[in-house]
Swiss-Prot record:
Superkingdom in the source lineage: Archaea
Family, similarity comment: Belongs to the UPF0305 family.
Database matches in Pfam families: DUF2115 (PF09888)
Protein name as catalogued: UPF0305 protein MTH_811
Organism classification: Archaea, Methanobacteriati, Methanobacteriota, Methanomada group, Methanobacteria
InterPro entries: DUF2115
Amino acid sequence: MKGSDALIMALRNMAATLGVYDLMEVRVFLERSCRFVQERYRAIYVDAYMSMVVDSVLDLKAGFSGTPEMDDARYSLRDALKRLDEINAPTIVGLTVLYRTYVKGEPLHPPGTPFPGGFEVEKKDGVHYCPVKDKQSDNPEALCDICIARQSPLP
């Protein structure tokens, strides 16, 4: 079994064990993680993240059958797991991060996510760009180092 197949199988098995309590736990985790986000963005972020979590779990429970987007140049899976452990991420957050990053090849902020200054996550020519990726390098709670998005070019 290839590593990517093993990852998908592990994520499917994790998703099969998740229930309503896990969704409540992740909501609390997200609200706590976003407590310093400007108020006008906080609800947008929490709702977007919750949507990603639910979509990821439902995809995996339905038996995602796409082609994994694993890329050797990305953050190593071992390092990603270590980072998730460092921030005490609930299992469901880890599942979502790993699924979106290593299986679907999607950024952790969906395209269209707004940021102060009128900037947002964008996808151009198949590449995702984030306006704040580099600015979050000193934030121990941020998972930007795992995210596939690149820093947006300066305007």
